Structure formats: structure tokens, C-alpha cells
């Protein structure tokens, strides 16, 4: 399959009110020569044209560490954590200046937002970040968002900007998330290694069969690979945000989407979750795991709460109100929610009926281990 394609459900970009565009390091920075200035100018030209048509654009941009590294002329090879953070500090200033100067050519302002994982995982900080970005958009500015790599550690980081972009898209209620990548979409296998790989232009929902393709069709250049892009899609689609994966190697990559260049379109859920459940669903790192029996799994599918009686194993370390993943006996995540008990209590009461819990804990039992109002179901079908 080659040339221009039609993708069911994808409209011209000017029809969307709010779009988040994720830009990877490999697109923005050449290891030897530094910033790809001409490519960035072409992207900003696309952004400016959409902005003139009333579309709000948010840019989630990698590249700070890579740019800082080229500025320091560091040799190839792994960097220590503090070296990466120093590169990020140098590169972030240069990156912000570059975006600011490029957008200024079109009379546009830009505002830099540096986020850590806790800024989207803690409810109050999440709401504050959302309010700040909304004000920037109201002022007509183009927010440029990145992970705050100068302070993020392995324990408190997104790890890739695909999922950060999805979190931003759902937080801001974006209509469309565009992941500009080194690969032009989703394939059944790796197109770099297998000429029989089939391109998939339209994905109605990200099922387990679709996820299996990510293991064999991963990008060879992208840090996150196809798996993190599908993780991003699950976060975005469940909240009502559609997603596009396409090659960012082309000049004017957003205009290329409108021209019909190859891309994969992931449809938004027809029944998006509400804002509260969007926040729950988007949690990237659940604090614990509750394994449940088949009867409990069926109850969740029918919209019931998770009772302690249906829990057969408890893992991780969590407190009341933390986010936990709920998995079946095969280890497949079927839901995610806010737990009503801490780890120690959950271990003591798992498998117990409600009337038994009070005597075990010494106080009146709460209605559920995870209440349905604090729970988001994952895709449970295997069909594509």
C-alpha cells in the first residue's frame, strides 16, 4: 500500500477545535548537527495556518536532552542521570527560544510548561496545570509542553512523551492527538524487517489483538516504540480524544495529514468517560494490583463495584485512595480505580464477605474494595 490514503473518521485538521501534537527528539534534533531548523519552521508554518483558522494547538515536544547534548558536544553513549538532567537544563532554554522565535514570525506567543508525573497524578496539581494551560490558550498562545527532565527521576517520570501527550490531551479535552513519529503508522509486523507487513489505516478500538502487533511492529528509532503509542491511544481514546500516528520526517507534517499521506487513525470512544474517570484512567503507574476471580470480573463487566469477596491476590504498596490496577487470573488488566482500603487492610479482607469484614478490621466495612464510580473498565474484547 502506498501513496495517498483515505482514513475513515479523520476530518481535515481545521475541523478540530483543539489538537495536541507530539514531536519526538529524533525529528527535532540531529545527533551530529543539532536542531533541524528548517523542518521546525515547516511545522510551525502548519501550526500558524491552523491557528489562523481558529484551531487551538498544544505542542508536546521532546528534544531538550538531545539538544543539550549536542550543545555540549558530548560523545555517544549512555549518560548518568545528573548528566542527562544537566543536558536538559541547557537544552530546554534553547528549545524554548527556538519555538518562541519561530512562532513570533507569525505573530504568535508561546508559553513553556514543564510537567512532572506528579503534576498529572495528584488531583490538585492536575487541576492547577489544566487551569494554567487553559489561560494560555485563552490568551491565544501556543503552549509548548515537555517533561521536566531536570528534576524527574526514574521513579517519578513518564518515561516517554507519547503518554505525556495523551495525558495532556485528555486533561485539556483535546479533540485530536497527533503523534509525529519515525514510522508512518501501525503495521501488523515490523515493515523494516518484514516486507509482508500490512499497514492498518483505521483502528476502531485498541484490543488485545491490536496490542500484540506492537510487540512485533515496534519502531526501531523511537524511544517509546509502538507499545507506548498504543498506551497513549488507550488513554486518549477512552476520554473521547481521537489519535493519529504518522511520520514526522516529512516537511510540513501536519499539512501532509490533510493531503492524505499515510497515517493510522484511532477512533475515539463513542462513550467517553467523564472528567473524574478520565483522570483515574490516565494514571500511568498504579500503586498496586488486585487480582480477581472470574465471577468478580463478570460483575465488573456488568457495571458492578468490586467487592472484597472477589479479590484473590493483592500486590504492591498502596494507601486508601490510591490508584490500583484490577487484573483477571491471566494477569490481564480489566479495570483501574481508586481503592477504598490500604494494602494491609486489603490483604486481611480479600476473599471475605461484607459481614465478615467488620469483625476482622474492627470497624464498619466500606461498601466496596473499589466502587464503580471510582473505576474505569479497560477494553475486554479481543476482536479487531
UniProtKB/Swiss-Prot annotation:
Its subcellular locations are: Cytoplasm
Q: Which GO terms describe its biological process?
A: L-proline biosynthetic process
Main location class: cytoplasm
Where does the chain bind ATP? 22, 181-182
Give the reaction(s) catalysed: L-glutamate + ATP = L-glutamyl 5-phosphate + ADP
Name the domain of life this protein comes from: Bacteria
Q: Which Gene3D superfamilies match?
A: Acetylglutamate kinase-like (3.40.1160.10), PUA domain (2.30.130.10)
Annotated GO molecular function terms are: ATP binding; glutamate 5-kinase activity; RNA binding
Positions with a binding annotation for substrate: 62, 149, 161
- Cellular component terms (Gene Ontology): cytosol
| Entry keyword Cell wall biogenesis/degradation | no
Annotated PUA domain residues: 287-364
* E.C. numbers: 2.7.2.11
Which pathway is recorded for this entry?
Amino-acid biosynthesis; L-proline biosynthesis; L-glutamate 5-semialdehyde from L-glutamate: step 1/2
* InterPro entries found in the cross-reference section: AceGlu_kinase-like_sf, Asp/Glu/Uridylate_kinase, G5K_ProB, Glu/AcGlu_kinase, Glu_5kinase, Glu_5kinase/COase_Synthase, Glutamate_5-kinase_CS, PUA
Keywords attached to this Swiss-Prot or TrEMBL record, sorted alphabetically, are: Amino-acid biosynthesis, ATP-binding, Cytoplasm, Kinase, Nucleotide-binding, Proline biosynthesis, Transferase
Q: Please report which protein family the annotation says this sequence is part of.
A: Belongs to the glutamate 5-kinase family.
Q: Which PANTHER family match?
A: GLUTAMATE 5-KINASE, ISOPENTENYL PHOSPHATE KINASE
Give a short account of what the protein does: Catalyzes the transfer of a phosphate group to glutamate to form L-glutamate 5-phosphate.
Q: Which NCBIfam families match?
A: proB
Protein name per Swiss-Prot or TrEMBL: Glutamate 5-kinase
**Name of the gene:** proB
Amino acid at each position: 500500500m502506498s501513496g495517498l490514503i483515505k482514513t475513515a473518521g479523520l476530518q481535515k485538521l481545521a475541523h478540530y477545535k483543539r489538537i495536541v501534537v507530539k514531536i519526538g527528539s529524533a525529528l527535532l534534533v540531529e545527533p551530529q548537527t543539532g536542531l533541524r531548523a528548517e523542518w521546525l519552521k515547516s511545522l510551525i508554518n502548519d501550526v500558524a495556518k491552523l491557528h489562523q483558522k481558529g484551531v487551538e494547538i498544544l505542542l508536546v515536544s521532546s528534544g531538550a536532552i538531545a539538544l543539550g547534548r549536542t550543545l555540549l558536544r558530548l560523545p555517544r553513549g549512555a549518560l548518568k542521570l545528573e548528566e542527562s538532567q544537566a543536558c536538559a537544563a541547557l537544552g530546554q532554554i534553547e528549545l524554548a527560544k527556538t519555538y518562541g522565535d519561530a512562532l513570533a514570525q507569525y505573530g504568535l506567543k508561546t508559553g513553556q510548561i514543564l510537567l512532572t508525573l506528579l503534576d498529572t497524578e495528584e488531583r490538585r496539581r492536575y487541576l492547577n496545570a489544566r487551569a494554567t494551560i487553559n489561560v494560555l490558550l485563552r490568551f491565544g498562545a501556543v503552549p509548548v509542553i515537555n517533561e521536566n527532565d531536570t528534576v524527574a527521576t526514574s521513579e517519578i517520570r513518564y518515561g516517554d512523551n507519547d503518554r505525556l501527550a495523551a495525558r495532556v490531551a485528555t486533561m485539556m479535552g483535546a479533540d485530536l492527538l497527533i503523534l509525529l513519529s519515525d514510522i508512518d503508522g501501525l503495521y501488523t509486523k515490523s515493515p523494516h524487517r518484514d516486507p509482508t507487513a500490512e499497514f492498518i489505516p483505521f483502528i476502531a478500538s485498541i484490543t488485545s489483538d491490536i496490542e500484540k502487533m506492537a510487540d512485533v511492529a515496534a519502531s526501531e528509532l523511537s524511544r517509546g516504540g509502538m507499545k507506548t503509542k498504543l498506551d497513549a491511544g488507550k488513554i486518549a481514546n477512552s476520554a473521547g480524544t481521537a489519535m493519529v500516528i504518522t511520520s514526522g520526517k516529512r516537511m510540513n507534517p501536519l499539512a501532509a495529514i490533510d493531503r492524505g499521506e499515510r497515517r493510522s487513525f484511532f477512533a475515539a470512544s463513542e462513550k467517553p468517560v467523564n472528567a473524574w474517570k478520565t483522570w483515574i484512567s490516565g494514571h500511568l503507574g498504579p500503586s498496586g494490583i488486585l487480582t480477581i476471580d472470574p465471577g468478580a470480573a463478570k460483575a465488573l463487566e456488568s457495571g458492578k463495584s468490586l467487592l472484597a469477596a472477589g479479590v484473590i491476590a493483592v500486590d504492591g504498596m498502596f494507601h486508601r485512595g490510591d490508584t490500583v490496577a484490577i487484573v483477571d487470573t491471566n494477569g490481564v488488566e480489566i479495570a483501574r480505580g481508586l481503592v477504598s482500603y490500604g494494602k494491609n487492610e486489603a490483604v486481611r479482607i480479600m476473599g471475605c464477605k461484607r459481614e465478615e469484614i467488620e469483625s476482622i478490621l474492627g470497624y464498619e466495612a466500606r461498601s466496596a474494595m473499589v466502587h464503580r464510580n471510582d473505576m474505569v473498565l479497560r477494553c475486554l474484547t479481543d476482536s479487531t
